[in-house]
């Protein structure tokens, strides 16, 4: 709370940065960033955005239902007192730890493999993540859950960063920020 208050006071010392409005009149379509949807006319971008949306849906399902899924094993006597059931949140939080650490790998991966291969690694990591999560159990298969949570970092970070760079590379400067927004909407 003190740090937040300190940052609030600091923000009042920053210089005034007026927004450059430009001389041209913008249409409602431009103001709302809807021109980014024109990217769906390009096959490569349409496939990318549809895949991103499907990945985003899968991500939201696993994020939203991971805890109830793990906790549901308490109805099976052999799993009721296992670590994965008793500490589902701790197990799931390994994903965030992995995500935090894997973001440090991105510069290395992009330099050595390039955007397309990093994106392919991310896609394979998503398959591995969902497969391990679906096949694991909180007893003898808890290692699959743990590995699934670790792989999540590579899957999430590599796809989101390489995807953002891909959108940046493939779009015109005039709609780039709208295209980035569309990418975020599709993946989240």
Task: State where each predicted segment sits.
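C-terminal membrane-cytosol helix-exit motif in multi-pass small-molecule transporters
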Residues: 3-20
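Juxtamembrane intracellular "pre-TM" segments in multi-pass secondary transporters
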Residues: 16-49, 75
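Pair of pore-lining "gating" transmembrane helices in MFS-fold secondary transporters
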Residues: 41-62, 150
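Short amphipathic helix-loop junctions that connect adjacent transmembrane helices
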Residues: 64-87
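Loop-to-transmembrane helix entry/capping segments in MFS-fold secondary transporters
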Residues: 85-86, 171-186
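Helix-to-loop junctions at the C-terminal end of transmembrane segments
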Residues: 101-115
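C-terminal ends and interior cores of transmembrane alpha-helices
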Residues: 125-138
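Intracellular juxtamembrane helix-capping segments at the cytosolic ends
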Residues: 157-172
């Amino acid at each position: 709370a003190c740090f937040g208050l300190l940052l609030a006071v600091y923000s009042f010392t920053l210089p005034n940065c007026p927004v450059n409005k430009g001389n041209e009149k913008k249409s409602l379509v431009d103001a709302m960033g809807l021109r980014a949807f024109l990217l769906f006319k390009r096959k490569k971008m349409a496939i990318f955005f549809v895949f991103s949306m499907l990945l985003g849906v899968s991500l939201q399902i696993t994020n939203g239902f991971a805890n109830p899924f793990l906790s549901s094993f308490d109805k099976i006597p052999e799993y009721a007192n296992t670590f994965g059931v008793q500490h589902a949140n701790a197990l799931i939080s390994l994903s965030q730890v992995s995500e935090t650490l894997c973001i440090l790998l991105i510069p290395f991966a992009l330099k050595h493999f390039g955007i397309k291969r990093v994106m392919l690694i991310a896609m394979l990591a998503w398959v591995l993540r969902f497969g391990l999560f679906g096949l694991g159990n909180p007893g003898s298969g808890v290692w699959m859950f743990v590995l699934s949570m670790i792989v999540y970092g590579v899957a999430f970070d590599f796809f989101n960063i390489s995807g953002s760079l891909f959108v940046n590379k493939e779009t015109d400067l005039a709609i780039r920020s709208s295209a980035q927004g569309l990418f975020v909407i599709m993946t989240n």
